[in-house]
């Protein structure tokens, strides 16, 4: 049995699966990345710890994501940690555009969508309307629906809710779904080209320019 995205299981699911696996006396492979959570609940479940401490298993660690090329991987690493700097890298397949407001961002995103770019949105709310729903074009692709997929050309949005903590870690205003984690989920879908749209956020624009010009 192979359970992919195991870090997103609920505790009751983990209990049920492990009980059935033990009863049937079969082998199971849990594939997980503790960084790939979308809500704070998934982080608090800490399934990685339960898998490694409660089960008789041998963890194997993959050093790099297979789907992501080094250029994009280096950019992501520096974007999510402003204290990480990797000099001597060129980024010919990463584009950067700044929009001063949601209206211009929505126009640009629709243009990119028409040109064949994949634009997974941040997951919309079920009871509330979040700010990011105002600029994404109408499409059915969101952070939750693209889990496990990959695309050649991906466009992402970094709006005014993103900033760095005092220790340099990227963060965002928390909703029910973590916007920071949704960004990580979306940006790691890119296989060949990445287009970053920064909206009304001068400090994040400066960081992106700093990375691209190293």
Language-model features, listed with the residues they occupy:
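Conserved helicase motor core of SF1/SF2 NTP-dependent helicases
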Residues: 1-114, 121-214
């Amino acid at each position: 049995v192979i359970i992919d995205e195991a870090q997103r299981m609920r505790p009751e699911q983990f209990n049920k699966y492990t009980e059935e696996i033990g009863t049937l006396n079969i082998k199971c492979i849990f594939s997980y990345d503790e960084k790939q959570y979308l809500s704070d609940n998934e982080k608090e479940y800490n399934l990685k710890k339960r898998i490694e401490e409660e089960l008789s298993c041998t963890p194997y660690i993959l050093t790099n994501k297979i789907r992501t090329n080094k250029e994009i991987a280096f950019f992501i690493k520096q974007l999510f940690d402003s204290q990480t700097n990797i000099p001597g890298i060129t980024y010919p397949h990463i584009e950067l555009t700044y929009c001063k407001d949601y209206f211009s961002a929505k126009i640009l995103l629709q243009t990119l969508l028409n040109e064949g770019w994949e634009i997974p949105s941040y997951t919309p709310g079920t009871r509330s309307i979040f700010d990011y729903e105002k600029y994404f074009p109408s499409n059915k692709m969101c952070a939750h629906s693209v889990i496990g997929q990959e695309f050649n050309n991906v466009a992402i949005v970094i709006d005014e809710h993103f900033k760095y903590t005092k220790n340099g870690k990227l963060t965002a205003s928390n909703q029910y779904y973590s916007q920071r984690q949704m960004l990580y989920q979306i940006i790691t879908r890119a296989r060949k080209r990445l287009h970053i749209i920064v909206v009304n956020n001068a400090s994040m624009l400066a960081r992106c320019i700093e990375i691209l010009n190293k």
